[in-house]
UniProtKB/Swiss-Prot annotation:
Region described as Disordered: 10-48, 101-120
Transmembrane segments: none
Alphabetical list of Pfam families matching this protein: DUF4645
Protein name: Proline-rich protein 32
Species of origin: Bos taurus
Domain of life: Eukaryota
Cystines in this chain: none
Length: 295
């Protein structure tokens, strides 16, 4: 009775379905005997064999292959336990000692060690772009391929590279001689003479020029007179009027366009009658000729 309850409850497949699955035929065989296992049995006809063998169970041949090094690869894997097969986390001890020693040296030197590491990286970059041995100076320390020279604690960075090599921005052309000191105030260029800027007395004179031309030649900035021939009747042929036309700026002119004033030429002719000056234009009397005709 208990056997039938187990079958109906779904704990095990029915004997009819088991027979059909084993023989490959889907037709049920009701003629098979119905057997009920005893209570001491493990399950319905299945022996108590584990699904997976234990991990530590190895044959003698496999143990010899693992313990002895192979002739081709020359590797040896110990089989003491699963910990030996597991790869260790992190670098091996020999590799881990090297950064540890480097850290100790840097910690003993302090900021000097950090500067040295930064210098090495910059030195590699500069050496990669330039073929010659570069000279590098960081924080007052000059580094070269030969040795190291330490100086004061300056905050500047000096990289000596030949011109046209590397991606460092090159400076402008350096002028060794004294240069002209020019200042631009309110649109007027003032150029001081070369030499010391501290001058006293009459030497404190500056040439003033407009910024239309070059700063070193202020005379060219002044407008040049342009003679214009007069076509007015009554004037001599030698009479000329001088007007100053400023040069045209190339792109931008800070000054507004100033109009050129010309004096009107004198008019030679009969003078106007004085009667028009005595009376205003709105109260002028009628002419005398018209009054005589009306009378």
């Amino acid at each position: 009775m208990a056997c039938i309850e187990n079958v109906l409850g779904g704990h095990a497949p029915s004997p009819t379905a088991v027979a059909a699955a084993e023989n490959g035929n889907r037709e049920p065989r009701p003629s098979l005997p119905f057997q009920c296992p005893k209570d001491d049995a493990g399950s319905w006809g299945h022996p108590g064999v584990p699904l997976r063998p234990p991990f530590k169970v190895l044959s003698d041949l496999a143990r010899e292959r693992l313990e002895r090094p192979s002739e081709r690869t020359g590797s040896c894997i110990p089989v003491d336990g699963w910990r030996a097969l597991k790869p260790p986390y992190g670098p091996p001890p020999a590799v881990a000692e090297e950064p540890l020693a480097t850290g100790e040296v840097n910690s003993s030197e302090g900021p000097a060690g950090w500067r040295q590491s930064g210098q090495d990286s910059i030195n590699n970059v500069s050496q990669e772009f330039s073929g010659s041995p570069p000279a590098l100076m960081v924080g007052g320390t000059k580094v070269s391929n030969g040795g190291t020279e330490r100086g004061g604690s300056n905050a500047g960075l000096y990289v000596a590279l030949p011109r046209g090599q590397g991606f460092f921005p090159s400076r402008g052309p350096q002028v060794r001689g004294p240069t002209h000191i020019s200042t631009l105030r309110s649109g007027i260029m003032m150029e001081l003479p070369p030499g010391s800027t501290r001058v006293t007395g009459k030497e404190r004179l500056a040439r003033v020029s407009f910024p239309l031309g070059g700063p070193r030649h202020p005379v060219k900035n002044w407008p040049r007179p342009m003679p214009l021939a007069s076509s007015t009747t009554g004037l001599g042929s030698r009479t000329t009027a001088h007007c100053f036309i400023p040069p045209r700026p190339p792109s931008f002119n800070p000054f507004l366009a100033m109009p050129m004033a010309f004096a009107p030429p004198p008019i030679f002719g009969p003078p106007l009658p004085s009667c028009f000056a005595d009376f205003p234009s709105w109260g002028m009397p009628a002419p005398a000729s018209s009054n005589r005709e009306n009378n």
